[in-house]
């Protein structure tokens, strides 16, 4: 695997605490839209959009991971939107909701508004 580079513009490598970390509880959407993958270098569409501001990060999101929903029924894959090579997203994330028991994406139109998940995000 070839390494493209290290995010030196974002002060990486760095000790913990050099950049803001955020924990945010995010409610699911009332009507989920399945992810449609983008072309190479293009963000996917659909899913649940979460802004950098909703994560408490005023400038950008560099990394994010979800703990999954409160009842264990769902997990989430976090995508940078847009993904900027060697930089962060100045917009936010797209969340792809997955059913924990099968690993399949949640169907379109499913109401996830009663579910909450926690996201750890690092940014600036």
Where are these regions (language model features)?
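Extracellular attachment/recognition segments
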Residues: 36-112
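Extracellular receptor-binding modules and their adjoining Ser/Thr/Gly/Asp/Asn-rich linkers
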Residues: 1-49, 114, 118-124
């Amino acid at each position: 695997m070839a390494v493209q580079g290290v995010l030196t513009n974002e002060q990486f490598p760095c000790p913990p605490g050099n950049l803001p970390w955020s924990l945010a509880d995010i409610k699911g959407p009332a009507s989920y839209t399945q992810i449609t993958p983008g072309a190479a270098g293009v963000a996917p569409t659909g899913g649940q959009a979460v802004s950098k501001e909703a994560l408490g990060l005023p400038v950008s999101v560099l990394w994010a991971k979800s703990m999954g929903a409160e009842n264990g029924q769902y997990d989430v894959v976090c995508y940078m939107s847009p993904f900027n090579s060697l930089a962060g997203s100045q917009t936010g994330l797209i969340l792809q909701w997955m059913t924990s028991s099968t690993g399949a994406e949640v169907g379109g139109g499913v109401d996830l508004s009663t579910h909450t998940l926690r996201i750890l995000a690092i940014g600036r």
